[in-house]
C-alpha cells in the first residue's frame, strides 16, 4: 500500500503503541510473503525502516515497518532510487580526459564519457594517486568532502574511501559541514557545545511544562521525516499531542518565519512574519524591551552569565555605532511593527517559554549572529535549564527531543589507519598549506590557492590541490554558485567520483565508479538516531545492479594495487565485519540491554529497547554551575566573548550585533534590481538531493517536469504568471527554469525553491541555464564571517519572469552521453 500525504498526516495524529517491557525480537526478515511468492525482507533507510517484497530478484513492494507509527510518504520513492534511469551502471571515464588527460579542462562538464572495465578504471585511479603524490605531495589531493551518505554502520562510503586513500598517502580534508557550519562554530563560545547536534530537552517535558513555544525558522513536521540513522519518526506522536494542546489553548505556539511553513499549517498556530535575514535586528529590539521594561531575569544573568553589561551598552546605543536598538529601529528593518515587538518580548516572560531554533537561519551571511542573539534573549528570559524552558537548536533534526534509551549503538568501519600503520607515501609535508580547510571554502582553494584566510581564531592557507576523490556525496548539490564552480573545476587535473547515481558531480568528474545502493548490500544500524530505540539488521534486498559494487569491495580492489588489501579489510568479509560490529556492540551494552547471539538477531531483524527517560538540557548547569560548568572558556553562558573579541574580526565581534547583508530583499542592498528573497531550505520530499532521481515519486511534486518555485499570488499576477507556468529565475550569478506554484503561504517579496534539486545545465558553458531548477545556480559562495567561514546560501536575492522561449529538455537525469 502506498503511503499518501493524507495517511501520513493521519499517522501523525495517532499515539504510538507501547513497546513491550525490555528488548523484544520483532518479525522475521525472510518470512513468506502473503502472496505465497517471493520473500519479505526487513531493511532501513534515512526515511525509516521497511519491509520489501522480493520476487524474481526484484523489489516489488515496500511497506513501513510496524514499529513506525508515522511513516513518511517518501518510502514510496525508494524503488525509484534502486531502479532509477540515473543509476551509474558501469565504470566510466571522461572522453577528453582519457585522450588529453589534465589538459582537457575546457570541456569538463560536457558529459561525454567512455565505458571501461573495472580493472581499467581502478588502474587509472591508482595511477593518478601515484602521480599526484609523486609530482606534488599530499597538499595536492583533496579527499575530505562531506555528505549524508546512506545509512548503515559498516558501509559508510566516506570511511571506506578515506581509509583506502589514506593507506596510499595523506590528503587535504575538511572541518565543519554545510547544514550547521555557522551554528556549530559559534555556539561552543556561547553555551559550551555545538548545540546543533546535542540531545535536547525531552518533548514530554516541553508538553507538560511549556506555556509558550517559539518555532523560530523551524519546520519540524517537514524535517523530521528523515534521520541520520534509520529513522523511527517517534517525534510525530509528540507533535500530535502538541496539536491537541494548541487546539485546546493549553500551549501558545508562535512561528517566527518569513513563510508559513508546514508545521504551522499542521499545528494551526499563530505566525509572526519577519523580513528575511533580519532576525538579529528583531532579537536586539526584544532585548531592549526586556531590559528597559525590567522584564529580564537579573538573578539568572548575574548567576549564570558573563558579559551582559557590554552587550546591553550596545543595545542602548552607547557604543561606537551610537544606535539605540529600539523596537522602532528594528521595525524599519524587520518589517514587524514596534508594538508587536514589545508584545512578543512581554509574551516570552509571561510563562514558561521554550525557544526552538531551526538551522536555515544560520545559513546566511553573518549566520553566527542569530544563534548567539537568540541565546542571549533566552538568557534574559532566565529559563535555561528548566523543564519546558530555555533554548534548543535541534528539535527539528533526527528525533532530537525523543528520550534516549542509553543504548550504545554499533561502531563503524574505521576511516583512519590502524595504529602503527603508515601510508605508502608517508609524506606530511603540505608545502606550507593548511591540511584542513573549512568545508565551504574548497572552491576558494581552486580559484585563490595560497590565499590566507581567517578561521575560528586561526589562519588557513588555501591549498592548491590538483585532484579530488569524492565518495557518496554530491558537492554539485550542496555547494553554492554553479558558474563559479564551473570556473573552479577547470583548475582540477583529475576528479574521481564513487557514486550509485549519475549526479552533476559525476558529470563534472573524470573517473566515475559505480557503487551499489544500500539495498544491494548488508549492514547494521541504530534504529532511532537520538532515541537509540533499537538496532536493525539491514538486509540486502537484491544483488548489485549492472556492474555496481559495494564500496568495501571497490576499495579492497584499489588497495590491492599497492599491497594493502589485507590491512584494509583486516582479513574480514562484509558479513564478518557486520558480525564483529554487532558483537562489540553487545559487549558494550552488557548488563544494560539484553542482546541475542548474532545469527538470531540477523534472522529476527530488529531489537526494540522501548523508551528512554525524560531529560532536561542544561538542568545540571542550572542546578550547580560551579560543579557542572559549560564548555565555554569561563564555564558560564558568554553573552560577550572576550576570546572572539581578541580575534579582531570585522564581521563577528565580541557580542551579538546587527550587520547589514551584502544583498537583502525588502529594501535591503541590491533589492532595487533583484527584489525577491530566494529561500532554499531543506526539501519536503527528499533528503537534500537524495531521491530526486526517483522518477515516479518526483512526478508527484514536479511542475512540467521541473522543480517547483513557490510564489505569492500577487507577485505572480504582476508578472503574468499562472499556476503551472514555467518561470525563469535569475540574478547576476545564474539562471534556472522552475514550475510555478502559487500560494499565500509565502509573503510578497519571497519565493522558495527547495535545495536538492539536481543541477541540469543546458551545456558546460558558464551562464548556461539550469533546465531543472537547482537553486544553488543562484546562491552566492561567500563565508558567513571570519569566524565560521560557513555557507551563506540564504543570503540570495533574485528576480523572475514567465518563461516564453523554446523549452529545453531537462538534462539532470539522463546519465552520461556514452561515446563508443
Swiss-Prot record:
Q: Which Pfam families match?
A: Molybdopterin, Molybdopterin_N, Molydop_binding
Entries under SUPFAM superfamilies matching the protein? ADC-like, Formate dehydrogenase/DMSO reductase, domains 1-3
Q: Tell me the InterPro entries matching this sequence.
A: Asp_de-COase-like_dom_sf, CT_DMSOR/BSOR/TMAOR, Molybdopterin_N, MoPterin_dinucl-bd_dom, Mopterin_OxRdtase, Mopterin_OxRdtase_prok_CS, Prok_Mopterin_Oxidored, TAT_signal
Cofactor(s), names only, from the UniProt record:
Mo-bis(molybdopterin guanine dinucleotide)
Keyword Metal-binding found = yes
Against Gene3D superfamilies, the record matches this protein to:
2.40.40.20, 3.40.50.740, Dimethylsulfoxide Reductase, domain 2 (3.40.228.10), Dimethylsulfoxide Reductase, domain 3 (3.90.55.10)
CDD domains for the chain:
MopB_CT_DMSOR-BSOR-TMAOR
Q: Which residues bind Mo-bis(molybdopterin guanine dinucleotide)?
A: 179
What is the enzyme's class at the highest EC level?
Answer: oxidoreductase
Subcellular locations according to the entry:
Periplasm
Q: How is it modified after translation?
A: Predicted to be exported by the Tat system. The position of the signal peptide cleavage has not been experimentally proven.
NCBIfam families noted in UniProt: PRK15102.1 (NF011682), TAT_signal_seq (TIGR01409), torA (TIGR02164)
The text of the family note is:
Belongs to the prokaryotic molybdopterin-containing oxidoreductase family.
What does this protein's UniProt record list under function?
Reduces trimethylamine-N-oxide (TMAO) into trimethylamine; an anaerobic reaction coupled to energy-yielding reactions.
Protein's recorded name: Trimethylamine-N-oxide reductase
Q: Which organism is it from?
A: Vibrio parahaemolyticus serotype O3:K6 (strain RIMD 2210633)
Amino acid at each position: 500500500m502506498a503511503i499518501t500525504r493524507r495517511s501520513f498526516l493521519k499517522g501523525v495524529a495517532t499515539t504510538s503503541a507501547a513497546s513491550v517491557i525490555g528488548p523484544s525480537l520483532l518479525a522475521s526478515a525472510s518470512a513468506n510473503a502473503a502472496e505465497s511468492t517471493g520473500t519479505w525482507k526487513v531493511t532501513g533507510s534515512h526515511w525509516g525502516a521497511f519491509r520489501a517484497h522480493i520476487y524474481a530478484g526484484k523489489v516489488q513492494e515496500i511497506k513501513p515497518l510496524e514499529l513506525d507509527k508515522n511513516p513518511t510518504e517518501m518510502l514510496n520513492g525508494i524503488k525509484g532510487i534502486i531502479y532509477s534511469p540515473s543509476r551509474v551502471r558501469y565504470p566510466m571515464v571522461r572522453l577528453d580526459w582519457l585522450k588529453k588527460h589534465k589538459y582537457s579542462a575546457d570541456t569538463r562538464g560536457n558529459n561525454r564519457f567512455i565505458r571501461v572495465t573495472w580493472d581499467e578504471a581502478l588502474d587509472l585511479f591508482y595511477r593518478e594517486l601515484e602521480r599526484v603524490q609523486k609530482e606534488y605531495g599530499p597538499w595536492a589531493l583533496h579527499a575530505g568532502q562531506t555528505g549524508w551518505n546512506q545509512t548503515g554502520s559498516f558501509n559508510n562510503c566516506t570511511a571506506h574511501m578515506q581509509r583506502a586513500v589514506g593507506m596510499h598517502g595523506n590528503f587535504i580534508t575538511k572541518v565543519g559541514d554545510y547544514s550547521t557550519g555557522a551554528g556549530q562554530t559559534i555556539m561552543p563560545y556561547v553555551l559550551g557545545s555545538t548545540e546543533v547536534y546535542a540531545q535536547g530537552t525531552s518533548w514530554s517535558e516541553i508538553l507538560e511544562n511549556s506555556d509558550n513555544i517559539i518555532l523560530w525558522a523551524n519546520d519540524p513536521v517537514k524535517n523530521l521525516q528523515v534521520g541520520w540513522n534509520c529513522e523511527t519518526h517517534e517525534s510525530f506522536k509528540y507533535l500530535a499531542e502538541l496539536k491537541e494542546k494548541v487546539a485546546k489553548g493549553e500551549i501558545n505556539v508562535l512561528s517566527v518565519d518569513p513563510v508559513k511553513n508546514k508545521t504551522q499549517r499542521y499545528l494551526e498556530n499563530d505566525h509572526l512574519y519577519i523580513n528575511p535575514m533580519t532576525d538579529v535586528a528583531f532579537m536586539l529590539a526584544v532585548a531592549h524591551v526586556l531590559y528597559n521594561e525590567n522584564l529580564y531575569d537579573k538573578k539568572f544573568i548575574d548567576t549564570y552569565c558573563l558579559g551582559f553589561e557590554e552587550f546591553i551598552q550596545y543595545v542602548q546605543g552607547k557604543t561606537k555605532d551610537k544606535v539605540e536598538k529600539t523596537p522602532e529601529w528594528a521595525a524599519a528593518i524587520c518589517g514587524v511593527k514596534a508594538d508587536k515587538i514589545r508584545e512578543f518580548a512581554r509574551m516570552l516572560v509571561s510563562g514558561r517559554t521554550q525557544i526552538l531554533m531551526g538551522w536555515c537561519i544560520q545559513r546566511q551571511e553573518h549566520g553566527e549572529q542569530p544563534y548567539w542573539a537568540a541565546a542571549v534573549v533566552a538568557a534574559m528570559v532566565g529559563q535555561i535549564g528548566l523543564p519546558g524552558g530555555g533554548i534548543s537548536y535541534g528539535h527539528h533534526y533526527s528525533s532530537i527531543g525523543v528520550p534516549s534509551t542509553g543504548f550504545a549503538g554499533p561502531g563503524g568501519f574505521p576511516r583512519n589507519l590502524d595504529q602503527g600503520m603508515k601510508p605508502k607515501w608517508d609524506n606530511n609535508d603540505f608545502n606550507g598549506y593548511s591540511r584542513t580547510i573549512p568545508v565551504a571554502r574548497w572552491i576558494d582553494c581552486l580559484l585563490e590557492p595560497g590565499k590566507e584566510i581567517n578561521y575560528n581564531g586561526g589562519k588557513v592557507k588555501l591549498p592548491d590541490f590538483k585532484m579530488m576523490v569524492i565518495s557518496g556525496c554530491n558537492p554539485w548539490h550542496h555547494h553554492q554558485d554553479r558558474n563559479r564552480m564551473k570556473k573552479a573545476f577547470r583548475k582540477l587535473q583529475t576528479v574521481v567520483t564513487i557514486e550509485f547515481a549519475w549526479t552533476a558531480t559525476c558529470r563534472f568528474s573524470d573517473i566515475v565508479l559505480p557503487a551499489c545502493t544500500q539495498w544491494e548490500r548488508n549492514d547494521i544500524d541504530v534504529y532511532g538516531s537520538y532515541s537509540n530505540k533499537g538496532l536493525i539488521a539491514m538486509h540486502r534486498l537484491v544483488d548489485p545492479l549492472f556492474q555496481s559494487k559495494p564500496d568495501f569491495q571497490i576499495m579492497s580492489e584499489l588497495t590491492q594495487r599497492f599491497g594493502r588489501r589485507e590491512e584494509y579489510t583486516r582479513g574480514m568479509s562484509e558479513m564478518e565485519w557486520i558480525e564483529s560490529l554487532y558483537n562489540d556492540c553487545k559487549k558494550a551494552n552488557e548488563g544494560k540491554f539484553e542482546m541475542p547471539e548474532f545469527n538470531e538477531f540477523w534472522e529476527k531483524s530488529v531489537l526494540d529497547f522501548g523508551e528512554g527517560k525524560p531529560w532536561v538540557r542544561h538542568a545540571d548547569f542550572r542546578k550547580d554551575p560551579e560543579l557542572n560548568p559549560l564548555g565555554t572558556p569561563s564555564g558560564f553562558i558568554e553573552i560577550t566573548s572576550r576570546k572572539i573579541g581578541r580575534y579582531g574580526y570585522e564581521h563577528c565581534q565580541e557580542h551579538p550585533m546587527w550587520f547589514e547583508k551584502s544583498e537583502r530583499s525588502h529594501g535591503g542592498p541590491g533589492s532595487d534590481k533583484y527584489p525577491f528573497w530566494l529561500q532554499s531550505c531543506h526539501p519536503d520530499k527528499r533528503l537534500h538531493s537524495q531521491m530526486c532521481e526517483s522518477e515516479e515519486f518526483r512526478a508527484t511534486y514536479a511542475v512540467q517536469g521541473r522543480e517547483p518555485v513557490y510564489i505569492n499570488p500577487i507577485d505572480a499576477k504582476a508578472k503574468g504568471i499562472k499556476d503551472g507556468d514555467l518561470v525563469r529565475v535569475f540574478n547576476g550569478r545564474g539562471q534556472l527554469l522552475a514550475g510555478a506554484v502559487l500560494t499565500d503561504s509565502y509573503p510578497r517579496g519571497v519565493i522558495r525553491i527547495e535545495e536538492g534539486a539536481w543541477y541540469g545545465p543546458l551545456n558546460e558553458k558558464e551562464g548556461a541555464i539550469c533546465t531543472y531548477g537547482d537553486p544553488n545556480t543562484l546562491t552566492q559562495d561567500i563565508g558567513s564571517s571570519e569566524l565560521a567561514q560557513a555557507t551563506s546560501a540564504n543570503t540570495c536575492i533574485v528576480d523572475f519572469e514567465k518563461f516564453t522561449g523554446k523549452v529545453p529538455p531537462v538534462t539532470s537525469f539522463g546519465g552520461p552521453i556514452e561515446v563508443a
